[in-house]
Regions:
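Active-/binding-site microenvironments in catalytic and ligand-binding cores
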Residues: 1-233
Length: 233
């Protein structure tokens, strides 16, 4: 399971101060003598483990409900950025990192789902540790790893199906131009953010299934992501 549970601890982008709200419609015994529970919830699209649909940063691109299913499952290529992230909280996946991965594990095939492991999910749900700052409404002082524009362009050239990361954004915390978002989403490559448990995956051999809520006209939405691990021999 690559998904953080949605609850009162769920981390959202700092400018969204609403958080995740769950209210009880009914919980307990009914007049009929049986137990029944039902709840209502409210959430922004871009919080917790979620999808960024192409429309999020690229005009006239697919909305959440129009992302092709073929982009939401496929073979994983997991690139480990943890060594860089351990010494630099603003580390960026580089073109050289992709080249090193391919030298060790072979070319990234078209329709792969590329996952970037930074180790940041271990900081969840501590907002300041995870985001680098916990000032409500202020996204100007964030620090966490991400993907460089150059690396994003390489992944577009590889014709990958999707790109995911275990941080709050595919762009690193200090980004002001969000070029990784712009490059990937303009190419209609969806992004999965706030993933977890990437430490359980091998560099090659896993399959990823990442199914978002089908929000009509949405720019993203809550995501249930999972990996199917290769059989041990």
């Amino acid at each position: 399971d690559l998904t953080h549970a949605f609850d009162r601890h769920t981390i959202y982008w700092p400018t969204d101060t609403g958080g995740f709200k769950k209210t009880t419609v009914w919980e307990g015994q009914t007049e009929g003598g049986y137990y029944y529970s039902a709840y209502a919830y409210a959430s922004a699209e871009h919080g917790g483990t979620h999808l960024d649909a192409p429309i999020h940063f690229a005009a006239d691109r697919p909305t959440a409900d129009k992302v092709p299913l073929a982009r939401l499952f496929g073979p994983a290529a997991l690139i480990d950025l943890q060594p860089s992230a351990a010494s630099d909280p603003d580390a960026l996946l580089s073109e050289a990192d992709i080249s090193a991965f391919e030298s060790a594990h072979g070319p990234i095939a078209a329709d792969s789902i590329v996952l970037v492991r930074t180790g940041w999910s271990a900081r969840w749900p501590q907002r300041k540790a995870y985001l680098g700052d916990d000032t409500p409404g202020d996204a100007s002082k964030l620090h966490f790893p991400g993907v460089s524009a150059e690396a994003a362009r390489v992944l577009v050239a590889r014709k990958v199906a999707a790109v995911g990361i275990d941080t709050a954004s595919i762009d690193h915390g200090p980004s002001k131009d969000f070029m990784a978002h712009r490059v990937l989403l303009d190419a209609e490559i969806p992004v999965f953010e706030n993933l977890t448990a990437l430490d359980k995956l091998p560099a090659r051999g896993a399959w990823v299934v990442a199914l978002p809520m089908k929000i009509g006209g949405g720019s993203g939405g809550p995501l249930r992501a999972m990996a199917i691990l290769p059989r041990k021999r």
